[in-house]
């Protein structure tokens, strides 16, 4: 019984720290107020393969690679990102030009690499 009490005391002492950590994280997300779009790169496709953005509205793209190193290149939005194998790259962008654009993987990732692209539509 006495072995449980020190463990329980330690656990109870840690709970406020855990709550403070969660509160801080939640506040940072709300304070940022920038929409996040998750994009997954996997041989030989991006998912989703189409997204729509608003001209002049800032958005954060969270680029994940599930397998090998990929690229994310889109000249009109001045994006040229490397997504290392098994990791995540974040980029913040504010589109200044309306239109429909094609982003490509510009890092050779295998035989069907040339077909790896996605459509990004920027609306007024």
Predicted segments with their positions:
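Cleavable N-terminal signal peptides
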Residues: 17-18, 29
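Beta-strand cores of secreted/periplasmic/IMS beta-sandwich domains, seen most often
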Residues: 34-36, 49-68, 87-97, 122
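Extracellular/periplasmic metallocenter environments
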Residues: 85-124
């Amino acid at each position: 019984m006495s072995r449980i009490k020190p463990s329980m005391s330690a656990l109870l002492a840690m709970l406020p720290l855990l709550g403070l950590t969660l509160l801080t994280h939640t506040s940072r997300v709300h304070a940022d107020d920038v929409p996040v779009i998750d994009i997954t790169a996997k041989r030989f496709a991006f998912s989703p393969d189409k997204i729509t953005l608003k001209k002049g509205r800032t958005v954060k793209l969270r680029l994940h690679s599930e397998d090998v190193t990929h690229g994310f290149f889109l000249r009109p939005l001045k994006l040229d990102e490397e997504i290392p194998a098994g990791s995540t790259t974040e980029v913040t962008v504010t589109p200044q030009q309306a239109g429909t654009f094609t982003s490509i993987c510009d890092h050779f990732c295998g035989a069907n690499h040339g077909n790896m692209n996605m459509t990004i539509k920027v609306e007024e």
